[in-house]
Amino acid sequence: MRKQVALVTGAAGGIGFEIAREFAREGASVIVSDLRPEACEKAASKLAEEGFDAAAIPYDVTKEAQVADTVNVIQKQYGRLDILVNNAGIQHVAPIEEFPTDTFEQLIKVMLTAPFIAMKHVFPIMKKQQFGRIINIASVNGLVGFAGKSAYNSAKHGVIGLTKVGALEGAPHGITVNALCPGYVDTQLVRNQLSDLSKTRNVPYDSVLEQVIFPLVPQKRLLSVKEIADYAVFLASEKAKGVTGQAVVLDGGYTAQ
């Protein structure tokens, strides 16, 4: 991965930041992207302070003109773009009959349309290079249903389909496209959701883990962001050149049941 250039969206924190860090640790030049400029700059600065080659480019992944501009800037500055990680995501939970249509459409836009737009604009560069690694962060919710997550599940199922099409179109040009499907991961977003649930149920945080999450996960634990990042590194590596069009599951056994 040394001397390669990687763009990671939604990289100001959580899984995205850890993926950016692990890519940088492997020697890649990393472009940290996020909708929030200050958080984006802070994340890139943190990586730079750790001695890594990192730059911040904040932009809205749903705005095609901004995506095109970002890809052009990267191409001009680095002369190449080897790795794309589509990680940006948002969440909303509600029964179908109570789910606001505009919220549903926004989730689809961020987590399905945005990866399509990004792939659309990096494919020409990767085809010209005859090399590319695209990793779409999907979810176990892209493989199974989950009540209350109609938009999230629809987007994640869709991005797995997009991944397969991208893999077929990219294969003749040295481009691999895969989807990572994490289960429950120890991120701030998940911790906030569990904290809200503990308040709603008036039970301790650990009780929420024991009563709600662990019955679903045979390993009885949350995955770490580094576990997800390590697998992203593998998929971007030469060792995984034969892996493409796959929905790779890391879920502590959740979908084995």
UniProtKB/Swiss-Prot annotation:
Positions with a binding annotation for NAD(+): D34, D60, V61, N87, Y152, K156
Enzyme class (EC, first level): oxidoreductase
One MF annotation (Gene Ontology) recorded for this entry: oxidoreductase activity, acting on the CH-OH group of donors, NAD or NADP as acceptor
One GO biological process term: fatty acid biosynthetic process
InterPro entries for the chain: 3-OHbutyrate_DH, NAD(P)-bd_dom_sf, Sc_DH/Rdtase_CS, SDR, SDR_fam
EC number: 1.-.-.-
Active site: Y152
Keywords: NAD, Oxidoreductase
Recorded family membership: Belongs to the short-chain dehydrogenases/reductases (SDR) family.
NCBIfam families linked: PHB_DH, PRK12429.1
Designated name of the protein: Uncharacterized oxidoreductase YxjF
Phylogenetic placement of the source organism: Bacteria, Bacillati, Bacillota, Bacilli, Bacillales
